[in-house]
Curated annotation (Swiss-Prot):
NDH-1 can be composed of about 15 different subunits; different subcomplexes with different compositions have been identified which probably have different functions. This is NAD(P)H-quinone oxidoreductase subunit N. NDH-1 shuttles electrons from an unknown electron donor, via FMN and iron-sulfur (Fe-S) centers, to quinones in the respiratory and/or the photosynthetic chain. The immediate electron acceptor for the enzyme in this species is believed to be plastoquinone. Couples the redox reaction to proton translocation, and thus conserves the redox energy in a proton gradient. Cyanobacterial NDH-1 also plays a role in inorganic carbon-concentration. The lineage of its organism: Bacteria, Bacillati, Cyanobacteriota, Cyanophyceae, Oscillatoriophycideae. It is a peripheral membrane protein. Belongs to the complex I NdhN subunit family. Keywords: Membrane, NAD, NADP, Plastoquinone, Quinone, Thylakoid, Translocase, Transport.
Length: 157
């Protein structure tokens, strides 16, 4: 890999395909450079981990219920379960799109540990970018000796 790369081919691939699978060296550092290049080209980047996402569609685009850590507290309703109250929050992608700056091209959902996503969840990420062109997805699928990327749709074939 060249010492200095501009990242233009990566940005073009993200803009063209919408969802990109990334393989980065395990020692790290490369993904930060590409995140910076995406920010400089006009995107807002949201970092997520694939572990614990649950229902990907609900987490990204719909209002969904969450429970904060209960810390041993009992439920106020008197059921006796140590589960706590349920709070409803908007989806991450929907909320970020509503608060997007005027000059921004859109948002990039940078998802680490993407190898835990099922095929159906990966297909949803591809269809999400096709349905809403302001949302782009970059999924880190694993490690490699050099930074490489390809459209996520090609990985599903």
């Amino acid at each position: 890999m060249a010492l200095l790369t501009t990242g233009k081919s990566f940005i073009r691939t993200v803009e063209k395909s919408g969802a990109v699978a990334v393989y980065a060296p395990l020692e790290g550092g490369f993904e930060g450079r590409y995140v910076r290049r995406l920010r400089c080209s006009g995107y807002s980047v949201v970092n997520l981990t694939a572990r614990g996402l649950g229902d990907v569609a609900a987490y990204l685009t719909q209002y969904h219920g969450i429970r904060p850590p209960h810390l041993g507290k009992k439920d106020i309703a008197g059921s006796g379960a140590a589960v706590g109250l349920r709070y409803y929050v908007p989806g991450i992608a929907s909320y970020q799109l509503e608060n997007l700056p005027q000059k921004s091209k859109g948002i990039i959902l940078w998802i680490i540990e993407g190898f835990v996503l099922s095929r159906q969840e990966q297909e949803y990420l591809v269809s999400l970018t096709q349905d809403n062109p302001q949302i782009k997805v970059v999924v880190e699928m694993g490690g490699d000796r050099q930074f490489s990327f390809k459209p996520l749709a090609d990985l599903l074939v």
